[in-house]
Amino acid sequence: MISDTNTYPVGAGMPAKRPAGTASSAMPIRGLARSHRVRVNLGLCALAAAITLAGCAGLPDQRLANEAMKRGDTALAERNYKALADLGYSEAQVGLADIKVATRDPSQIKEAEATYRAAAATSPRAQARLGRLLVAKPDSTQAEREEAETLLKQAAKQGQSNTLIPLAMLYLSYPQSFPKVNAQQQIDQWRAAGNPEAGLAQVLLYRTQGTYDQHLGEVEKICKAALNSTDICYVELATVYQKRGQADQQAALLGQLKAAYARGAVPATRVDSVARVLADRSLGQTDEKTAKDLLEQVAPANPASWVSLAQLVYDFPELGDTDQLMAYIDKGREAEQPRAELLLGRLYYEGKTLPADAQKAEQHLQAAAEAGEISAHYYLGQLYRRGYLGNVEPQKAVDHLLAAARGGQNSADYALAQLFSEGHGIRPQPGNAWVFAQLSQANPTPQSAELLQQLDQQLTPDQRNQAQQLLDQEKRARGSLAQGANSTLALEALQDDEKEVDGEDSL
């Protein structure tokens, strides 16, 4: 087991009723007719009043909620969705659950799962949402994975989009749960059948297998063909051109993107994603000025882009001073963006742009972690591992670093290897250190490779066998989507398809 006290399990997983009236049988026919009209009018008035109390005529409320969601006004959307959801409208229940999922708060996501499940009996959209949510659920059970497969297949048969990529993710994440399914063969069948999502499922497989760079030509071909119907392809094509250094093709793509955004065919979130590709040093030569222009264009309509702008200025200080950086962060925090809390906590943690303040760093990082920001767990773990708050707190460090590592942050594995190797606040545990040093080799650095070599020399054959068992256990706990699960394509696959028919059409 992996713990500062030898008790921490590595592979265990992360933790109206219409009023009735009666007529006298002795009433004359003319009076009966008049009475009937009165009762009908009263009944209609009562029904209208009930609907008004619920939120102002059902259909306009649903439309208002949908429009508010597109604007990012989740408070208004939630009020209107709830009014209709309380009346039993399944599509409004779906909208309400979508808002809960978007918070990334574990308790809210749990409520969303229950809401989707309640609506799934009558709503194919709810089936698709629930299936996607179960695919993304940490430490899902075998029963939940099988349920996700069933739901996504049912939703696909009923015409719901954005179902095949989550299915592909399910098969790639948990091959042991679906031993009869070969992901590549399944994708080949989908492509042969002409399913429009199948090409993107193939792209996801390349990302997952770490062979994306070897298939840039096919990725380009797939996404060029799907660009008009699947706007996530703007991100994939931008990535391809960035990796190849094809400035002319990138400029042409950005022109298409701007035109599509101007006519409302592409959401602001997609523009934000492309801007982040342009500013990603790991993809090749950056174009941070164009990235800033794109983000400034969409930030008023997409509050998350204020944080993207802050991150851009942080990464490229020549684009703005500290006042500009903090102004962007403040706008992000005003919009309750967890990434803003993460970046502010990181600034206090590093002590470069702002004076170092471990207490403030902990406060903001904790807020970000509670909202689902995986990187916040990494920095919290380092705070506790290094004793920045006054004392080394090894168990807190293990908890947060393990959460970060299992969430896909590779640097957390190296930090865990250091923790168990150095033994600050705990006795050294070279077997545990070896496990995480091995896991850190998914994206090796000279430092992690050197540490692994040192640990290799320290372990006895028995210790090596025990450590290998723990390593296998931890790998099973994490699944096999280490390289692909955090890609934009994968994340989008688990979220709502913005091109789906608005919910009021189903009411």
Place the predicted regions along the sequence by residue:
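Terminal, low-structured helical/coil segments at or just beyond the last alpha-helical repeat
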Residues: 446-507
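Alpha-helical adaptor scaffolds
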Residues: 346-350, 366, 370-409
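Short helix-capping/linker turns of helical repeat alpha-solenoids
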Residues: 87-89, 103, 121-124, 137-138, ...
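Structural signature of tandem alpha-helical TPR/SEL1-like repeats
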Residues: 72-76, 104-115, 140-151, 175-186, ...
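C-terminal motif of bacterial Sec signal peptides marking the signal peptidase cleavage site
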Residues: 53-55
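Hydrophobic face of amphipathic alpha-helices that form TPR/SEL1-like repeat modules
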Residues: 95-102, 131-137, 167-173, 204-208, ...
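Post-signal-peptide N-terminal segment of Sec-exported extracytoplasmic proteins
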Residues: 63-114, 125, 162, 166, ...
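Bacterial signal peptide processing site
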Residues: 57-59
